[in-house]
Swiss-Prot record:
One Gene Ontology cellular component: glycine cleavage complex
Lineage of the organism: Bacteria, Bacillati, Actinomycetota, Actinomycetes, Mycobacteriales
Subunit text: The glycine cleavage system is composed of four proteins: P, T, L and H.
PTM annotation (N6-lipoyllysine): residues: 65
The name this protein goes by in its record: Glycine cleavage system H protein
Family stated for the protein in its record: Belongs to the GcvH family.
The species this protein was found in: Mycobacterium leprae (strain TN)
Cofactor: (R)-lipoate
Stored SUPFAM superfamilies: Single hybrid motif
Gene for this chain: gcvH
Length: 132
């Protein structure tokens, strides 16, 4: 079974978020997603300062099996991108919850962030969505 840390929130699109500050979240792909994708060979991410809309595509991940869209779990402004993925996209496979993170999103309205997080899945609920 895939690794599903209990301290994260999850989307139906197999992305995780971790609150790093009151107004900022870190976003990445789940262990299930990376194992389903196979070897990741390229990750396309937006520039710092780009505006994201929850539920809308913000980039792509290309693997030996397919190209998949990445979807924003929250609305906000990209405050950091993982530039290590440019030269080492395989970090998404080897360390999806650590060095393989994708981007940080700053949300100016903390109340809106609280509401957005409340709509995401906890670890147990996410685990229940996975096909065995």
């Amino acid at each position: 079974m895939s690794d599903i840390p209990s301290d994260l929130h999850y989307t139906a699109e197999h992305e995780w978020i971790r609150r790093s500050r009151e107004d900022t979240v870190r976003v990445g792909l789940t262990d299930f997603a990376q194992s389903t994708l196979g070897d990741v060979v390229f990750v396309q991410l937006p520039e710092v300062g780009a505006e994201l809309a929850a539920g809308k595509s913000f980039g792509e991940v290309e693997s030996t099996k397919s190209v998949s869209d990445l979807y924003a779990p929250v609305s906000g402004t990209v405050s950091a991108v993982n530039t290590d993925l440019e030269g080492s996209p395989q970090l998404v496979n080897s360390d999806p919850y650590g060095a393989g993170w994708l981007l940080d999103v700053h949300v100016s309205d903390v109340g809106a962030l609280e509401s957005a997080i409340a709509t995401l899945l906890d670890a147990e609920t996410y685990r229940g969505t996975l096909t065995k």
